[in-house]
Amino acid sequence: MKSTIIAALFAGTALATPVAQAGQPISTPSPTTLVSGAYWIRAVTSPNYHKYLQTKPANVPGTAVLESHTTAGQFNIESGQLVNKVSNPPLYLWVEEPADKANPPRTLATWFNTTKNSFGTFAWQGDTLTWSVPSVKRQNVAAWLVCKNQALFINTGAYSYQTPAGCVDQTIHYYNDKTANN
């Protein structure tokens, strides 16, 4: 009887904090104010205008996506590594290493992991985020693609030419105002 009453009291009640399954990383909210030494990274053209780099859920290992300013990650480049400055532990942006570097696929997947990326180097070109590696020739080191589910890919082809179906060409840039905006 007692357990029935307790179950009835909690039926339909939502938990205020996320609950992780055993062994799963716990998502932590991104600060809404930029931390010292970090930048927001966002697209500045449609259809992803002011969509920000992050993972879903926020600040855990997973696919790199461009999404809402309300859950934006905060980043900087350290020794060629793009690092999420607000995740604990830090997350590093990884790039898929193709089997045939001389003829790579048009898209190279990106994701965040707790270990340092072993393939390529990230750099700023002005405020633009670039990625390069000597073994993969690219026409534009600042060319990215946003594809299904807002996933971010390295574009190994020409920017805005023969864009793969379901993807859009994008460049992404740092933004250093105190708060991310829409």
What are these regions (language model features)?
Residues 56, 64-102:
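Short, well-structured hydrophobic secondary-structure segments
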Residues 49, 69, 78, 101, ...:
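Surface-exposed charge patches in extracellular/virion surface proteins
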Residues 10, 16, 27, 35, ...:
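Compositionally biased amphipathic helical and low-complexity segments enriched in hydrophobic
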Residues 21-61, 112-182:
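Extracellular glycan/ECM-engagement signal in secreted proteins
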